[in-house]
């Protein structure tokens, strides 16, 4: 009664209700006044809750209006087909798709789809459990072993999302006595994961080895117990490739661990598609590798971390996204095994992607556009002005080419661009049509002559 009375007195009409609840006899003798008071109190609480809800909704609307006014609102276009060289939009138009992470064209590959169907038939739709209770099937263990072999590590652990792989990495491994050193342009999942750990933090200028060494020297001077340098293997907005060979040398000099996120590299970077570490000649010499099944490796969802067996074992015990998230669905596990079968059997898809990338980079430059130099299938076409980037993307869609403009806060102010992504599923006719559309739209908007 005392607790109820105290709660009631915080609301309008609470004094009367409080007296009734404290009264062991009199107020309960006549129930009508009590129920009148209860009704009044309940109504006042409901009104207060409604007012709070209205204020909150008004706040959210103001936030959304601000995003629209600043040109930062991200609209979602609906497509009605699988990912491919072309897709159909909700209005039924078929457009050339230049903005998917479907680097190898495997998201709709017949063998991958059949493997997913077979896993559904043999292992079910979902596990309704986390891994350590009853959510581990033979498919999951097989995939972990295959991933570890593919990227050149002893063991691997699966996550429901690649974001979780990075989000659950740093806190279990690093403590207050340690240091983590991160590239300034690392992915949001790396940044968020680092924020969750207690290690001292350094951030070095993008791909700048001199500044990385400065950070390592400062961590040494502070007496850091363990040091972990972590970088994207490939940076998603620029397509720049981390200098892992130089980074490995620096880490060896300063007795530091090296970790990479391979989301935009696994499956196609390097001679056999093993990733950035193969591309840079340090395959088997990277301590921790995170990656995704949501891009080149099938395009669905899910992520992984690969490392020494002791690292993976500790993550199984302490990585919160792994411990408290449902298991990767069997169909994704089965399909991902089929993806690795394809990639280990042949480099044909990787080779075609490289050919498409070389051709498009040359052709779009010849059309008068400025692009970020490089060799990655991410091709940033620089527009610089955010409004112009949105106008260019909209006009290209009208011309039958689906791309997206990127601008602040996704990239720095004044660095707006169209990010084009090549795929092995593109044929030359798709790329020729796309370059012609870029040239037409660019002339109309005064971006090229």
For the regions a language model picked out, list residue spans one by one.
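Active-site phosphate-binding strand-loop segment of PLP-dependent enzymes
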Residues: 102, 202, 206-260, 423
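N-terminal "arm"/small-domain region of PLP-dependent enzymes with the aminotransferase-like
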Residues: 56-125, 256
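Conserved PLP-anchoring active-site segment centered on the Schiff-base-forming lysine
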Residues: 169-188
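Conserved N-terminal alpha-helix of the aminotransferase class I/II PLP-enzyme fold
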Residues: 114, 118-162
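PLP-dependent enzyme catalytic core of the Aspartate aminotransferase-like
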Residues: 42, 46-49, 54, 110, ...
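Hydrophobic, low-acid, alpha-helix-prone terminal segments
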Residues: 7-21, 34
């Amino acid at each position: 009664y005392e607790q109820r009375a105290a709660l009631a007195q915080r609301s309008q009409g609470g004094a009367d209700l409080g007296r009734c609840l404290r009264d062991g006899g009199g107020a309960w003798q006549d129930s009508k006044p009590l129920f009148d008071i209860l009704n009044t109190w309940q109504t006042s609480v409901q009104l207060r809750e409604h007012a709070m809800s209205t204020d909150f909704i008004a706040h959210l609307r103001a936030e959304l209006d601000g995003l629209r006014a600043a040109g930062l609102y991200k609209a979602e276009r609906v497509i009605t087909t699988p990912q491919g060289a072309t897709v159909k939009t909700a209005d039924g138009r078929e457009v050339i798709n230049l903005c998917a992470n479907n680097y190898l064209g495997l998201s709709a590959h017949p063998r991958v789809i059949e493997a997913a169907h077979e896993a559904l038939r043999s292992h079910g739709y979902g596990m309704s459990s986390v891994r350590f209770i009853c959510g581990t099937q033979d498919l999951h263990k097989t995939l972990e072993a295959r991933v570890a072999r593919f990227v050149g590590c002893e063991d691997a652990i699966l996550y429901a999302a690649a974001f979780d792989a990075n989000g659950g990495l740093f806190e279990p491994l690093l403590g207050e006595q340690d240091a983590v050193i991160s590239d300034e342009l690392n992915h949001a999942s790396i940044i968020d994961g680092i924020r969750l750990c207690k290690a001292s933090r350094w951030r070095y200028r993008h791909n700048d080895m001199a500044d990385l060494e400065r950070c390592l020297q400062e961590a040494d001077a502070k007496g850091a117990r363990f040091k972990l340098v972590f970088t994207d293997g490939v940076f998603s907005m620029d397509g720049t490739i981390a200098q892992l060979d130089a980074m490995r040398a620096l880490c060896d000099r300063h007795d530091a661990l090296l970790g990479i996120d391979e989301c935009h590299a696994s499956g196609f970077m390097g001679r056999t598609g093993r990733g950035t570490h193969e591309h840079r000649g340090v395959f088997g010499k990277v301590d921790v590798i995170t990656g995704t099944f949501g891009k080149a490796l099938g395009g669905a969802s899910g992520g992984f971390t690969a490392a020494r067996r002791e690292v993976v074992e500790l993550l199984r015990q302490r990585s919160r996204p792994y411990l408290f998230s449902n298991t990767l669905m069997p169909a994704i596990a089965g399909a991902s095994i089929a993806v690795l079968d394809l990639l280990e059997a042949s480099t044909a898809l990787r080779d075609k992607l490289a050919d498409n990338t070389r051709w498009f980079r040359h052709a779009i430059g010849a059309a008068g556009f400025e692009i970020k130099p490089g060799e990655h299938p991410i091709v940033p076409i620089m527009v610089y002005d955010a409004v112009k980037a949105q106008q260019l993307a909209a006009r290209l869609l009208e011309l039958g080419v689906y791309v997206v403009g990127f601008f602040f806060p996704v990239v720095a102010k004044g660095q707006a661009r169209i990010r084009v992504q090549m795929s092995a599923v593109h044929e030359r006719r798709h790329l020729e049509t796309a370059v012609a559309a870029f040239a037409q739209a660019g002339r109309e908007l005064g971006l090229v002559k």
